[in-house]
Amino acid sequence: MARIMSFAQQKGGAGKTTVLVQLAHHWMQAGHKVALVDLDPQGSLSRWAGLRGGVDCTASSDWKASSDIRAAARRADLVLVDCPGNADILLRATIRDSDLVVAPAQPSMMDLWALEPVVEMARKEKTPLRVVLNRVPPQGRAAEEARGMIEADLLNEQIGNRVVFQQAFALGKAAAELQPRSKAAEEVAALAAALDAIR
């Protein structure tokens, strides 16, 4: 049975889709059969998949979402869902159908506040959730301070604020393809391993 992992965050600019595609590439390279489902009206995941080519990606919405996720689960062993930004019925249903919710957030108060409805939904649906700090600045105490404010399971693994992630996304690629031995590639691999260990 496929594992369904949803990426959810209400605040735009948190890097939800960027984190998803980095992990998708990592798991594809590791031999997983990965299917992507894009529920975000912005369609960034679908655009990335279109640039890349050869990726199993379904753009879906409202009434089709559940059936599209189930169909993807029949084709793959790992389904990654890019959730819509608003906390509505569709997001709740997707969280209910998921094995794990990944909630990327920048280490800022606005991002952390925006996590609260997603965290509460996951609790109500009894779906495991992990917060991932993303776009963490190289200097300062922002990440450390954020860790003290999050009332949810927060992974130790985090993603730094690195230009290569945006550069790769614009080309339909992953950071590890542009800079295979970079800190960015190491961070994605470490995050993937941490998520793999959650069952």
Residue ranges and their predicted role:
Residues L36, V81, A103, V131-L133:
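Structural beta-sheet core signal
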Residues P41-G43, M109, V136-G140, V163-V164:
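Conserved nucleotide-binding/hydrolysis micro-motifs of P-loop NTPases
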Residues I4-A14, V21-R92, E120, Q166-E177:
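P-loop/Walker-type NTP enzyme "switch/lid" segment
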Residues A175-R199:
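NTP-binding/hydrolysis catalytic cores, primarily Walker-type P-loop NTPases
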Residues L112-N134:
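Conserved C-terminal guanine-recognition region of P-loop GTPase G domains, centered on the G4
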Residues P137, R147-A174:
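Beta-strand-loop-alpha "switch" segments that mediate conformational coupling across diverse proteins
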Residues N86-S108:
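Inter-motif core of Ras-like GTPase G domains
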